[in-house]
Regions:
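N-terminal cap/leader regions of alpha/beta-hydrolase-fold enzymes
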Residues: 1-200
Length: 200
């Protein structure tokens, strides 16, 4: 997926979100199976990955980008899938003068009771947001999507929330059982169009 975005002409930085659990943290193939030991281990690690430390990581990534002479200084885009969807939105709010475009694909916990829930800072975003939601998604259910739509409008956020009909959480990843090629291709089209508009 990183290579595909790179072929469009962008420099792409892919962070290891799990590095706090060890730089060599990996999960076996059964991490995709509900009830498996690997999935439980992944969830235990994930619960410690709250937005504040990830925003510190985002600051470090922006500093790294700025230190690279071969990368033209300018607006930055970010996007995330599943649990990293809220990180992308939070980063757009935390660094509004740098992040001109952000996208979340079947992002979880976009609206929650957490103090750092992304919906609370939509009004701080200066860039454009694109949020794609799956119709069948227990991790980002339709009531949350409907609430987010209302909040989006009230905050005056520039962007779009789109519901992908008939697909499941994880539809963009080719190795998942829920992979849906037409929806996955649409997500690429929407993402690259967003980046072209905002990043050039």
């Amino acid at each position: 997926m990183v290579r595909r975005l790179g072929t469009v002409g962008y420099n792409v930085l892919l962070p290891n979100l799990y590095y706090r659990a060890g730089h060599d943290t990996i999960f076996g193939p059964d991490v995709l199976e509900e009830g498996s030991a690997e999935r439980a281990r992944m969830r235990a690690v994930r619960t410690k990955m709250t937005i504040p430390p990830v925003m510190d990581d985002a600051a470090a990534m922006l500093a790294f980008i700025d230190s690279q002479a071969e990368i033209k200084r300018g607006p930055v885009g970010c996007h995330g899938y599943c649990m990293s969807g809220p990180y992308a939105l939070a980063a757009a709010a935390r660094y509004p003068d740098r992040i001109a475009a952000a996208a979340s694909f079947y992002g979880t916990w976009l609206v929650s009771d957490a103090e750092e829930s992304p919906h609370l800072s939509l009004n701080k975003v200066k860039g454009e947001l694109y949020i794609a939601c799956a119709e069948h998604d227990s991790l980002a259910p339709l009531p949350m999507v409907e609430e987010l739509l209302a909040l989006f409008g009230r905050a005056g956020t520039v962007g779009e929330i789109e519901l992908y009909p008939g697909v499941h959480h994880g539809f963009a990843f080719p190795l998942r059982w829920c992979y849906d090629k037409p929806a996955a291709e649409r997500h690429w089209e929407r993402l690259t169009a967003l980046y072209r508009r905002r990043l050039g």
